[in-house]
Amino acid sequence: TAIGKQADSSKDLSGPKATPVKPTLLGLNQGSRLFGDAYSNIVTWIMDGATFHDCTDDALKNSANLYQIGNVSVREDAQGRRFIVSDVPALFDATGGAALQSVLGLTVGALALKTSPLIMKAQDVLGKENLKVIMHGEYDFTMGIKGYQFKDGVKSPTDAQLTTAANWTRIATSVKDTAGVQVIFGNKAA
């Protein structure tokens, strides 16, 4: 999305439909290469389970399982980079017959979230055959992506608007000052 639409922060390693490119640690290294001498700023790879296992098949023999929360597991390789493994639908694109697997390499402070507490109100409804209580609650959150600005004029964006690349503008002049990189594996549509 925001990261992937920038040519200097996205490495597309996908192949044609007949010869898909399997995710590998070497491919992830090509993604971190986009940061040049600041490659060590990429501290975390976010990927789905299938992509992680493809990398495991390749060379991830000495990983340590740090912890697991529900279906999200956090692992670490010998270089100290963390692998957050979760089957996030946005990391896989099957549009038009493609089978593209995206991996995000993120820096420290790549994302910032601030939430407000849940405010709940209850009101009794009287004078009817049965008693009722109407409850209403709301909360909000603020999200920031390092080196990017969300489109002006969009108030209370939906999930679809937040994941639309056109709604994000990169304000950092160098890729090294952004949230990170995207590496794409798999195959393009025919």
Predicted regions and their residues:
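Hydrophobic alpha-helical segments involved in membrane association or supramolecular assembly
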Residues: 41-43, 48, 135
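Sequence/fold signature of self-assembling virion shell proteins
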Residues: 12-25, 29-30, 50, 54-190
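Short, glycine/acidic-rich hinge or "gate" loops at secondary-structure transitions
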Residues: 1-5
